[in-house]
Swiss-Prot record:
Catalytic activity: acetate + ATP + CoA = acetyl-CoA + AMP + diphosphate
Cofactors: Mg(2+)
Residues that, per the record, bind CoA: 196-199, 316, 531
Keywords annotated in UniProt: Acetylation, ATP-binding, Ligase, Magnesium, Metal-binding, Nucleotide-binding
Name under which the protein is recorded: Acetyl-coenzyme A synthetase
rRNA-binding among keywords: no
Gene3D superfamilies: 3.30.300.30, N-terminal domain of ligase-like
A biological-process GO annotation: acetyl-CoA biosynthetic process from acetate
GO cellular component terms attached to this protein's record: cytosol
NCBIfam families for this protein: Ac_CoA_lig_AcsA (TIGR02188), PRK00174.1 (NF001208)
Signal peptide limits: none
Length: 655
């Protein structure tokens, strides 16, 4: 990779307020440095101490890091635990009646669920799963609305040792099908419909469509939560109502005591080539990362009301809805709806109503709320807030400043968190009582995380120069492998051409400034980041080419002030180059086709038609040139070898 020049020059810096520092879990820079040096001095001892402090073990571990077969690292692998017990049972003796979840529906109905009640619901459902023959090691796909029941389903799987794979409710039947097939799922947990922004979206019908695609005989049970009460098709031998399944089940369910390395879940994330990657996470190491980051980054206090707006279909919803807050004993808000329904101030109303202290959302949401004006948040009482967080993509400095000044009223630290589906929890983020923040920077690695910026051989790059972001040592919360694809795991994350395969390759480019702060510059592969969601170009291109009108397609990202990036598709048709009216008709058809094949999130913002696509002599599509066309930039590449230079003009036209 050629050296990347940083074009962002941001000099503003915000030290934490003295009152915040005084009450913080990591209080002052010295506290951060002490932990960082502990990890540097005794790496395995550092993680062992944290694992003993934050995790309740059924059988204590004696071995910390097993690195006998790199990069397939194992942590605490002779210990045993249960994740659900750590999230629920351990709190019953001291805070059974504390509110675990405040749920607010799309329509505004509010339900408070205590730790005692959540434990009871999880045990009922776990016993129901067992009654269907679902056992430890079985894979269960969860395709649910953003409700308490989604968390119950995940926790129930964890309780019996089943491996869950949650699919975002906006994904299509084909996406659900691919994940069912790859996971070899025994069961699917879903609902009749989901409600978002006043609109009803089918879930059970989508599951039925997925299961009708063939080769799904492994699925013996479909469990359906009755949400809207709409009519659905039913297969009596296969389908089970949630309420029937839990009826009469005992209030207790003995947890399965599993090995620390037993998979807790797989979560499918987009890759730059081919099918989605089934990221496989362990139990103990993953939970340790979720809990320590709640403590360090979110500075958790017992009276906090925590709200992470992410859906459980994404890793943020796993770590900071389903597991992290519950493991640390927090009260959190789960919201079913959208930021602006039924009115533009819905988010601010929720913060005011529930006295939220910690608010964690995506730059996409922040940018869309900025569009509505600064006077809107000012109409609500946001004085309960003490900490703001950003997740999913780098936040541009001006959005950071709006978030800090308008929402946080210039008194709440902003924690800009860099991490990935594969890392399981925060990697680079400010401990808000210890680290000064800079708009647009995720600041410094957390204690125990050895992050660096290197060139294509693994050597450090100069300060201010761009390079590959890597993590040089294994860490407990990292993915263990890709489901059924260990070789792809090795090649993707530990390529031998970078430091001999010793470093975890994040796939992001970054640079460090004079203070050692990290600045994320974007992806180095062909994965797009649309509204904080990673989408593989190969998947979208494959969907386009599957349409009978399309001969060839290439997809790139284009910066967008609200979504971060949008999808721009360059398409060659099987018919002649269409006129404007025909092009508009085809573009509309292809947009809906992609939405049905993958999901609405992947729908191209722009589609451009050409007689062919620009390629190198070896036949590779010239993606850099396409990116320049998409962004309206001056083309600096040598285009003299193009067989048909007129295509550049054709591909500059947006439909």
């Amino acid at each position: 990779m050629a050296t990347i020049e940083s074009i962002l020059h941001e000099n503003r810096i915000f030290p934490p307020a003295s009152e915040f520092v005084r009450n913080a879990n990591l209080s002052g820079r010295e506290a951060y440095e002490t932990l960082r040096q502990e990890a540097e001095h005794d790496y395995t001892g550092f993680w062992a101490k944290l694992a003993q402090q934050y995790i309740a073990w059924h059988k204590p571990f004696t071995r910390v890091l097993n690195d006998a077969n790199p990069p397939f690292y194992k942590w605490f692998d002779d210990g045993e635990l249960n994740i659900s017990w750590n999230c629920l049972d351990r709190h019953l003796a001291t805070q059974a009646d504390k509110t675990a979840i405040i749920f607010e529906s799309d329509a505004g109905e509010v339900n408070h669920c205590s730790y005692r009640e959540l434990h009871r619901q999880v045990c009922h459902f776990a016993n129901g799963l067992k009654s269907l023959g679902i056992r430890q090691g079985d894979r269960v796909v969860i395709y649910m609305p953003m409700r308490i029941e989604a968390v119950v389903a995940m926790q129930a799987c964890a309780r019996i040792g089943a491996i869950h794979s949650v699919v975002f409710g906006g994904f299509s039947a084909k996406s659900v099908y691919e994940r069912i097939i790859d996971a070899g799922a025994s069961a699917v947990i879903t609902a009749d419909e989901q409600i978002r922004g006043g609109r009803y979206h089918p879930l059970k019908a989508t599951v039925d469509e997925a299961l009708a695609m063939g080769d799904t005989a492994t699925v013996h049970s479909v469990i359906v939560f009755r949400h809207t009460g709409t009519g659905i098709t039913w297969q009596p031998e296969r389908d089970h109502w949630w309420h029937d399944l839990i009826a009469g089940q005992p209030d207790e369910c003995e947890p399965a005591w599993i090995n620390a390395e037993h998979p807790l879940f797989t979560l499918y994330t987009s890759g730059s080539t081919g099918k989605p990657k089934g990221v496989q996470h362990s139990s103990a190491g993953y939970l340790l990362g979720a809990v320590t980051s709640m403590q360090w980054v979110f500075d958790y206090h017992a009276d906090d009301v925590f709200w992470c707006t992410a859906d459980v279909g994404w890793v943020t919803g796993h770590s900071y809805v389903a597991y992290g807050p519950l493991a640390i004993g927090a009260t959190q808000v789960i919201f079913e709806g959208t930021p602006t329904h039924p009115h533009a101030g819905r988010f601010w109303e929720i913060i005011q109503k529930h006295r939220i202290t910690t608010f964690y959302t995506a730059p996409t949401a922040i940018r869309s709320l900025i569009k509505l004006g600064s006077d809107l948040p000012a109409k609500y009482d946001l004085s309960s807030l003490r900490l703001l967080g950003s997740v999913g993509e780098p936040i541009n400095p001006e959005a950071w400043m709006w978030y800090y000044t308008v929402v946080g009223q210039s008194r709440c630290p902003v924690v800009d968190t860099w991490w990935q589906t594969e890392t399981g929890c925060h990697m680079i983020a400010p401990a808000p009582g210890a680290i000064s923040t800079k708009p647009g920077s995720c600041t410094l690695p957390l204690p125990g995380i050895d992050a660096a910026v290197v060139d294509e051989t693994g050597h450090p790059v100069e300060q201010g120069k761009g390079g590959f972001l890597v993590i040089k040592r294994p860490f407990p919360s990292m993915l263990r492998t890709l489901w059924n694809d260990p070789e792809r795991f090795r090649k993707t994350y530990f390529p031998t051409d970078i430091a001999g395969g010793r470093y975890y390759l994040a796939g992001d480019s970054a640079h460090r400034d004079q203070d050692g702060y990290f600045w994320i510059m974007g992806r180095v592969d062909d994965v797009l980041n649309v509204s904080g969601h990673r989408l593989g170009t190969m998947e979208i291109e494959s969907a386009l080419v599957a349409h009978p009108l399309v001969a060839e397609a290439a997809v790139v990202g284009k910066p967008h002030e609200i979504k971060g990036e949008v999808v721009v598709a360059f398409v060659t048709l099987r018919e002649k180059l269409p006129d404007d009216q025909r092009a508009a008709e085809i573009a509309a058809t292809l947009r809906e086709w992609v939405a049905s094949e993958i999901g609405a999130i992947a729908r191209p913002e722009e589609i451009r038609f050409g007689e062919n696509l620009p390629k190198t002599r070896s036949g590779k599509i010239m993606r850099r040139l396409l990116r320049a066309l998409a962004r309206g930039e001056t083309i600096t590449q040598d285009v003299s070898t193009l067989e048909n230079p007129v295509i550049l003009e054709q591909l500059s036209q947006t439909v």
